[in-house]
Curated annotation (Swiss-Prot):
Domain Response regulatory: 3-120
Catalytic activity: [protein]-L-glutamate 5-O-methyl ester + H2O = L-glutamyl-[protein] + methanol + H(+); L-glutaminyl-[protein] + H2O = L-glutamyl-[protein] + NH4(+)
Changes after translation: Phosphorylated by CheA. Phosphorylation of the N-terminal regulatory domain activates the methylesterase activity.
Keyword terms of this UniProt record: Chemotaxis, Cytoplasm, Hydrolase, Phosphoprotein
Principal cellular location given in the protein's record: cytoplasm
Organism classification: Bacteria, Pseudomonadati, Thermodesulfobacteriota, Desulfovibrionia, Desulfovibrionales
InterPro entries: CheB-like, CheB_C, CheY-like_superfamily, Sig_transdc_resp-reg_Me-estase, Sig_transdc_resp-reg_receiver
Protein name in UniProt: Protein-glutamate methylesterase/protein-glutamine glutaminase 2
Gene: cheB2
Subcellular localization: Cytoplasm
GO terms under cellular component: cytoplasm
Amino acid sequence: MISVVVVDDSAFMRKALSTMLEKDPEIRVVATARDGEEGLQVIRQHNPDVVTLDIEMPRMDGLTTLRHIMMEMPRPVLMVSSLTTEGAEATLKALELGAVDFIPKQLSKVSLDIVRIENDLREKVKEVSKRRMLRTPRPVRPAPTASAPAQTAQVASAAPATAPSRPAMPATRASRPVRDVVAIGVSTGGPPAVQKVLSQLPADFPASILIAQHMPAAFTGPFAKRLDGVCAISVKEAESGEKLKPGTAYIAPGGKHLRVEQRVSHMEVVVTTDPADALYKPSANVLMESVGQSMGRRALGVILTGMGSDGMEGMKVLKQKGGRSIAQSDATCVVYGMPKAIVDAGLADEIVDIDDMAAAIMNGLYK
């Protein structure tokens, strides 16, 4: 049985979340609280497996409460967020502080998505209850430069995640990388993981990066802006018609897909709603397939932490066209779903701990 504490100043939300969660016989809401101070008391009392935490509350807000939880009694925390720019910025800060994911607060609205939201909530609670959390993503070693060999990333299956990385054997590199486009698919637990990876890449990174992160439309712009402020490379929300540039990461806008298309003299970004019936928007499958079809062996596909199997079908195409693939290790995922699908399908060329992912990507451009 998975125990949950719900912390929210809205009586409606406390009731709604509790009702949704307890529809699953494996989940029990052991207590609720109306603000952060009361929340800390009931968390200490009940020691729950998972906490859902509102951001805006009287007396003690969600971010302050989260800091106390992470310092005193770390456990998986799901933030309850409004789908606004302000809500997005606060939620991204919460993810940086240690929250594992977020759920939308607009549960009071009549919506055709309510069943999906309920299912996602229960699935997230069940998945994150099994996993350890990623801490605030700060670089753990100096970023490699494009002209100097990076350390070889450690394969998770060969050694524990806590083992030190071994220096790479000097690699004989071509004057230009073999691969010049990196496609990244990621979901639950993704923002801290993406920040950890991108913040370790050098400003002269010789490839373009395209990222499909499962995230609402109001969140992707602030997410890109936050990353751009802490990374040596440029990070932006993708716009149709842009020419792909090395040393730039393009974040797919929430609610839309990200593709690339060959033009006469360059590769171009395409933002689209097609296919409309895709389970996720943005979709890692759509991104991987497009990059595979357009770039062939010039593509490097990376699947990071996330629920489900989005990215697997697209990765099949990328691999068939000569691309290379990397999956995040089980030991370092918040949720080992999307990477597991790649590994189980035999599509992963490397399985890498998140701390070593930037180095693996650097080296992967030359393989």
